[in-house]
């Protein structure tokens, strides 16, 4: 069973609380166990806790959830791009799956609400699949025939 942590931004919590509910439901559907739900103030703050979360021995993968709503300036673009870049950097550094379930940039509130389920499910599904496949790859042995890890 994959042990999954969810890191959720509280900013735009009317949206991210729904994402959290959908993520937990989908994790259960996939047979994963949600071991931690960690709330942070905003999407930009997600990278601040990731190393602590992935260091937990009872976490195989992390799905990040958040919503960056378009405003009058380019602030949403900056927040979403920098958070995504740092999340990927940390995932590669720690060698554990950390997936991106962040709506935005450029999304308005209505678009974000329409994308709640899709983004939450995709982030959880990718995290669970990656964790399972990393384990399969680690345990795989080549014996003269191509090894497929799927």
Curated annotation (Swiss-Prot):
GO terms for cellular component: riboflavin synthase complex. Its EC number is 2.5.1.78. It comes from the Archaea. The active site is at 75 (proton donor). Pfam families: DMRL_synthase. Disulfide bonds: none annotated. CDD domains: Lumazine_synthase_archaeal (cd09211). The keyword Transferase applies. (2S)-2-hydroxy-3-oxobutyl phosphate binds at residues 72-73, 115. It is an enzyme of class 2 (transferase). Pathway: Cofactor biosynthesis; riboflavin biosynthesis; riboflavin from 2-hydroxy-3-oxobutyl phosphate and 5-amino-6-(D-ribitylamino)uracil: step 1/2. It catalyses: (2S)-2-hydroxy-3-oxobutyl phosphate + 5-amino-6-(D-ribitylamino)uracil = 6,7-dimethyl-8-(1-D-ribityl)lumazine + phosphate + 2 H2O + H(+). The keyword Transferase applies. PANTHER family: 6,7-DIMETHYL-8-RIBITYLLUMAZINE SYNTHASE, 6,7-DIMETHYL-8-RIBITYLLUMAZINE SYNTHASE DMRL SYNTHASE LUMAZINE SYNTHASE. Catalyzes the formation of 6,7-dimethyl-8-ribityllumazine by condensation of 5-amino-6-(D-ribitylamino)uracil with 3,4-dihydroxy-2-butanone 4-phosphate. This is the penultimate step in the biosynthesis of riboflavin. This is 6,7-dimethyl-8-ribityllumazine synthase. It comes from Pyrobaculum neutrophilum (strain DSM 2338 / JCM 9278 / NBRC 100436 / V24Sta).
